[in-house]
């Protein structure tokens, strides 16, 4: 862990609540959220269950983020009442309720909504990794950092993850 703790970032506490709990509390403020799924690492099974989250489905993650997301999406495919999905990194609880509302609102007419931040830092690309002196400065005009939560049409994101998991 980057911040020198044996406890995963999602389980760190702020004002007595884990980052997972903070995210769940925020999500529950929106009536459009019909189901909350927490994907956890196998080694964190006891820790996530100790949170005693009510009305939350726990799903064991996979060997990488893509597989973990796919495991969660599989739980939703038989739910006829769910056509859209929000995917969020539980280690990032500082999204605003205004952003959350905007994502939900924009999903009424979009296939996907992915919040982005313009890159301010200098961006470089190594052209030949065997000779690191060949570094090319990149224009930032078309480069962005993406954030979560991200929203997608369930069928489309499920199919993408399904096809990627087969590779």
Which residues are covered by each model-predicted region?
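Conserved core of the sugar-phosphate nucleotidyltransferase
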Residues: 94-167
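Residue-level signal for inorganic ion chemistry
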Residues: 20, 72, 89, 118, ...
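Short beta-strand-to-loop acidic/aromatic patch adjacent to the donor-nucleotide binding site
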Residues: 80-92
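N-terminal glycine-rich phosphate-binding loop and ensuing alpha1 helix
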Residues: 1-45
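Residues at the starts of beta-strands that form the adenosine-phosphate
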Residues: 34-36, 84, 111-112
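Short phosphate-binding loop-to-helix
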Residues: 51-83
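Generic enzyme active-site microenvironment
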Residues: 39, 87, 116
């Amino acid at each position: 862990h980057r911040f020198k703790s044996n406890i995963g970032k999602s389980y760190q506490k702020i004002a007595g609540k884990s980052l997972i709990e903070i995210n769940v509390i925020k999500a529950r403020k929106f009536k459009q959220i019909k189901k909350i799924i927490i994907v956890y690492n196998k080694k964190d099974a006891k820790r996530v269950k100790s949170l005693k989250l009510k009305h939350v489905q726990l799903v064991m993650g996979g060997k990488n983020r893509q597989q973990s997301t796919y495991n969660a999406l599989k739980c939703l495919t038989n739910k006829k009442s769910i056509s859209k999905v929000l995917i969020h990194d539980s280690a990032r609880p500082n999204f605003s309720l205004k952003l959350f509302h905007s994502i939900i609102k924009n999903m009424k007419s979009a296939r996907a909504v992915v919040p982005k931040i313009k890159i301010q830092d200098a961006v470089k690309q190594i052209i030949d990794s065997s000779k690191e002196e060949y570094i090319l400065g990149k224009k930032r005009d078309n480069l962005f950092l993406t954030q979560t939560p991200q929203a997608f049409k369930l069928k489309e994101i499920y199919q993408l993850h399904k096809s990627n998991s087969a590779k």
